[in-house]
Each structure stands twice: as structure tokens, then as C-alpha cells.
Swiss-Prot record:
Family: Belongs to the bacterial solute-binding protein 8 family.
Principal localisation: membrane
Protein species of origin: Bacillus subtilis (strain 168)
Complexes and interactors: The complex is composed of an ATP-binding protein (FhuC), two transmembrane proteins (FhuB and FhuG) and a solute-binding protein (FhuD or YxeB).
GO cellular component: membrane raft; outer membrane-bounded periplasmic space; plasma membrane
Name recorded for this polypeptide: Iron(3+)-hydroxamate-binding protein FhuD
Signal peptide region: 1-23
Keyword Iron: yes
Domain of life: Bacteria
PROSITE patterns: FE_B12_PBP (PS50983), PROKAR_LIPOPROTEIN (PS51257)
Gene from which the chain derives: fhuD
Record's bilayer topology term: Lipid-anchor
Pfam families linked: Peripla_BP_2 (PF01497)
Fe/B12 periplasmic-binding domain boundaries: 60-315
Lipid attachment in record (S-diacylglycerol cysteine): 24
Length: 315
């Protein structure tokens, strides 16, 4: 009998040991730490901050440069951390589950806690880049070096997801073609303006600084006013600053407008007599764009912007 008990005891102990080992294995797998990718295949990527050895297939990416979050999500990359602005983008609704809010994107400590295997930052983040490089491979990206389509292709090349980029681009081209037909029929050759206010300052945007400009002027081929073309498209950083008195010279037949940020001060611009006397205002052709949603230029945001622009100009 004692012999039987010993056998049963040994068997029971073995089962406990197996269960414990299985639990440990599941625990490490669910954590998905960056150590999993330390032995993964890497390659040298030429970034703005030099040559960086990064994993070929990153598993835990922290996107500190908020404008690039949607690019990585489109490419199916697991993003574990992103700045607060990302969570305010209406076009990301339902697309930030499981992503940690890292605040204003400057906290190195929050990044450490996320144990990333790749970090994406702006080139303007300066001294922080050196600190971040000690945590994980860090790639600095210059905001205006590439347009949104070329940037998507570059991130796809970086992460080995070219197939997903091409799939999205094919889908995007079809959406643009369908929208272009509808919009051209509705507005013809009439002019379109994109404006934002920051206090009393008024900014008029061209095709290369977000705010839906690439969609309106490049993809859809809609017309800008003469001065918008001269000051915000053919020269400058993609926008120009104007005074209230100059507003009528830049205003198109249709205007997409809004404050610089949600709840921001418009400096009384939209209540001024100059604004109210614009033809677009009097004809009901002013459309209020979401300042955060239209700040982003990634594929997810572009799809939302295209839908808003199409609905606005064809209703």
C-alpha cells in the first residue's frame, strides 16, 4: 500500500511540475517581451539618425511620432505605445485597443516599461533620441521628407510588409477614382480652400501639410485659388499665414475650415464681417473639419478624410 501511495505521490508531483512549466511558458508568451526578438533576424536601416540595426519583423513598436501611428496599424504591425494625440483622432476609433497612452510622447520612462523592440520618433525629438537608443533600436523620421504615399512605402520596406502596402494602395486608388467622379460632377472647376485659425492667425494650406490637402489638390485634382497656389503650393512649407484682411483673396468657392485644435480660440475670425461676407459662407459651402483628424496623413486618417470631403462636396 505504501508503495502505491509513493507512486501516486510521484505522479501527482509530476503533474504539478508540468502545470507550473506550462504556466511559465504561457506567461512569457503573453508578455511578449522584446527579449523574444533579441535573437530575431535584423538588418541595417538607413535612418535620419544614422544606420540603425532593427528587427526584420518587429513585434513591439512604440510610435512616439504620433503622425505615424496609422501607417504601422495599416501594415499590421503591433504597436504597444503611442502619444495621447493618437487617442483623440476620431478616425482611429476602435483601432487603439491594447495600445498604451504614453502622454505627450516625451516620457522615456513610459517607453522603458513597454519593453519595445523598435521605437519611431521625429527628428525634432533631439536629445531624447540618444536616451531612447539605449532602450531599443530607434528610427528618427523627418516629417516633410516624403509625401504620405511614399512614407507608407518606406515604412513597409522597413518592416517587410510591402504586400500590405500595395494592397492598401490598390484599394485607395479605387476609392479616389470613385470619389473623383462624384465630386467633379458636383463642383466642376470651382475652387477649394483649406483654412485653420490659431487665435487671430489664419493659415491657408496647400497639398503637402496634412489637413486633407493631398487628397483635395493631388488625388482629386481640385482647383486651389490663384493665391493659394502661389503662396502655399508652388512655394513655402505647404502653408501660408495671412491676415484677416487678406482672407477674401485666398477664399475659394468651397472652404474646409476649423480651429488649430479642438476647442481652440478662433480669434473671432469666424464671427467677423469679412468672414461672413465670403461667397462660400453665404452659399453654405463651408465645412468644419476635425482639427485632429485632419492633422494626420496616414492611410486610416486619409480614408476618413476622403469620406468627409466627398460627403461635404456632394450633398
Amino acid at each position: 500500500m505504501t508503495h502505491i501511495y509513493k507512486k501516486l505521490g510521484a505522479a501527482f508531483f509530476a503533474l504539478l511540475l508540468i502545470a507550473a512549466l506550462a504556466a511559465c511558458g504561457n506567461n512569457s508568451e503573453s508578455k511578449g517581451s522584446a527579449s523574444d526578438s533579441k535573437g530575431a533576424e535584423t538588418f541595417t536601416y538607413k535612418a535620419e539618425n544614422g544606420n540603425v540595426k532593427i528587427p526584420k519583423h518587429p513585434k513591439r513598436v512604440v510610435v512616439m511620432a504620433d503622425g505615424y501611428y496609422g501607417y504601422f496599424k495599416t501594415l499590421g504591425i503591433n504597436v504597444v505605445g503611442a502619444p495621447e494625440n493618437v487617442f483623440k483622432n476620431p478616425y482611429y476609433k476602435g483601432k487603439t485597443n491594447g495600445v498604451e497612452n504614453i502622454g505627450d510622447g516625451t516620457s522615456v520612462e513610459k517607453v522603458i516599461d513597454l519593453n519595445p523592440d523598435l521605437i519611431i520618433v521625429w527628428t525634432t525629438q533631439g536629445a531624447d533620441i540618444k536616451k531612447l537608443e539605449k532602450i531599443a533600436p530607434t528610427v528618427a523620421v523627418k516629417y516633410d521628407k516624403l509625401d504620405n504615399i511614399e512614407q507608407l512605402k518606406e515604412f513597409a520596406k522597413m518592416t517587410g510588409t510591402e504586400d500590405k502596402a500595395e494592397k492598401w494602395l490598390a484599394k485607395w486608388d479605387k476609392k479616389v477614382a470613385a470619389a473623383k467622379t462624384k465630386i467633379k460632377k458636383a463642383v466642376g472647376d470651382k475652387t477649394i480652400s483649406i483654412m485653420q485659425t490659431n487665435g487671430k492667425d489664419i493659415y491657408v494650406f496647400g497639398k503637402d501639410f496634412g489637413r486633407g490637402g493631398s487628397i483635395i489638390y493631388k488625388d482629386l485634382g481640385l482647383q486651389a485659388t490663384k493665391l493659394t497656389k502661389e503662396k502655399a503650393i508652388d512655394q513655402g512649407p505647404g502653408y501660408t499665414s495671412i491676415s484677416l484682411e487678406k482672407l477674401p483673396d485666398f477664399a475659394g468657392d468651397y472652404i474646409f475650415a476649423g480651429p488649430w485644435q479642438s476647442g481652440g480660440d478662433d480669434g473671432g475670425v469666424f464671427e467677423s464681417s469679412i468672414w461672413k461676407n465670403l461667397n462660400a459662407v453665404k452659399n453654405g459651402h463651408v465645412y468644419k473639419m476635425d482639427p485632429i483628424g485632419f492633422y494626420f496623413t496616414d492611410p486610416i486618417s486619409l480614408e476618413g478624410q476622403l469620406e468627409f470631403i466627398t460627403e461635404s462636396l456632394t450633398k
